[in-house]
Amino acid sequence: MNYKIPDIKERNIRFSKIKEAMQKNDIYALIIGGKGHWWTGRGYFRYLTDFHLWGHDGLIYFPIDEEPSLVLTSNAVANKISKRGWVNNCSGGLELGKELYNKLDIKKIRNKKIGIVGSESIIPHGVLNDLYEKLDIKNIVNATDLFDKVKMAKTEWEIKQIKNLWMLAQDTMVLFQDNIVGYSNNNKSQLEICSDINKVLWENGVRDLLVFYG
């Protein structure tokens, strides 16, 4: 599939796009929710850290004039995220609101507009209430749509990877189609057919467990 890990240039492009949108909306900082799951692990955290969450909840603090910081409900995974190099200030703890609060310069942000990303379905209700209570900032706005619109506009690297992924899917289906008579003649089971297809995907770097549901 010719997959290439995105470098720091890709990170900078994404960060610049987000900060441009923040500036247009007079938002000083974003607090972004992340939830590790098969479906949502590809979301906000992956976009900002290039690290796929399989479990754990987290928050990213993304100011317009400083490097972002991150808290996660696993210190070990937080350390792995920092080693990836996109967000370096990472720490773990079960009380996300408290952990993030300890990283902030409250005096600096007291009179600033803060945007929350993921308040509807990503950030747990208790964590969200804890944040509102601790921050005590009047000018908090919902910034989920803002972030989603930025994320929807794909970079050159993202477009290439999407194209590569679809080409891999196409090639895999053609391989199955070309061998379907042989599968029938050899009385191969559905499990054996899926295994043959998965071998192709694994050899090309596909590691998503959803493959096994095919």
Predicted regions and their residues:
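Flexible, acidic/His-enriched mid-domain "rim/lid" segments that flank
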Residues: M1-Y3, K9-F15, E95-L209
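Long, charged, glycine-rich C-terminal linkers/tails
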Residues: L210-G214
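N-terminal accessory/capping or targeting/presequence segment of soluble
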Residues: M1-N102, M167
